[in-house]
Design a protein with these regions (language model features):
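Cysteine-centered catalytic environments shared across enzyme families
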Residues: 1-295
Length: 295
């Protein structure tokens, strides 16, 4: 768990307030106690708090591409990063760290905004193309990692937690009555709404695109969907009998658990007392070939 935050001047000209970025980062220190990093460029300011899991010694963020024209800050993990890294290196990309997040800058170089279809993991990230003036805020398919944003005048602020938005000094902690009504009625909020006025969550499976203007005017943030659930049509029949489907599920599930055990630090399990967490931990122990410590 890391923390990301930042600001985007929609006019694309002003340098970010460094003290503001430091306040936003300080509000996220509990998410990333190991390190911090910042980026300041005309129109764009990034702040990152790091919890080291992969690439312990050289994974400071922001992470840049080879010529430092693309930069990224990320909270999350990419489970198939060794395979993606090998594919990108075969295409000529040069990596400078062992961090799994570095695949983002090279995937962007290779595929542009189609990079999302090549990601397998849980993540929230901010990427800037300094040459083209394009900023992308992306969130994983089902919204495991949080990402909130707010437009205040001609500036967009974003962060892993709303408290960091408020720490910027530009976002007021005013309650949204409808958001509170949803929270107290359903014990949850819709994918976009929050309990604060003017603050929204980036929806799962979406990314926010901001193209900074080259001349006058203001950029218009555009939210785009890159993924959705693919449900079968009514009446469709599954291929195979129950035993075949059970074997197929077990194979997919074991692979999903296996790739989530990759880390440069010890991996443990957290048991809630239910069947699902026990099943995950038992599968982890089986695929790892050893007991997995649990709490």
């Amino acid at each position: 768990m890391c923390g990301i935050a930042g600001s985007i001047d929609l006019a694309g000209k002003r340098l970010p307030d460094r003290a503001m970025l430091q306040r936003m980062a300080a509000a996220l220190v509990h998410r990333g106690p190991d390190d911090s990093g910042f980026l300041s460029a005309p129109g764009v300011g990034f702040a990152h708090r790091r919890l080291s899991i992969v690439g312990l010694l050289d994974g400071r963020q922001p992470i840049y591409n080879e010529d430092r024209t693309v930069a990224v800050i990320c909270n999350g993990e990419f489970f198939d990063h060794p395979e993606r890294r090998a594919e990108l290196e075969a295409k000529g990309h040069v990596f400078s760290t062992h961090s799994d997040s570095e695949i983002l800058v090279h995937l962007y170089e290779e595929y542009g905004e189609e990079l999302f279809s090549h990601l397998k993991g849980q993540f929230a990230f901010a990427l800037v193309d300094l040459t083209r003036g394009i900023v992308l805020l992306g969130r994983d398919r089902v919204g495991i990692c949080p990402l909130f944003w707010s437009r205040q005048g001609d500036t967009v602020y974003f962060a892993s937690e709303i408290k960091a938005l408020i720490a910027s000094g530009a976002v007021r902690p005013d309650a949204d009555p409808r958001g509170l009504d949803h929270l107290f009625t359903f014990f949850a909020l819709s994918s976009r709404r929050t309990a604060f006025k003017g603050v929204q969550a980036l929806e799962p499976g979406h990314y926010l695109r901001i193209e900074l203007p080259q001349g006058r005017g203001l950029a218009s943030p555009v939210e785009r969907k890159y993924w959705d659930f693919d449900f079968p049509d009514w009446g469709d029949e599954l291929d195979g009998d129950v035993e075949q489907l059970t074997d197929s599920f077990q194979s997919v599930f074991e692979r999903a658990v296996d790739i989530r055990l990759r880390a440069d630090v010890p991996v443990v399990g957290y048991l809630s007392g239910g069947v699902d967490s026990a099943f995950v931990l038992a599968t982890a122990a089986r695929v790892a070939g050893r007991p997995v410590p649990s709490f």
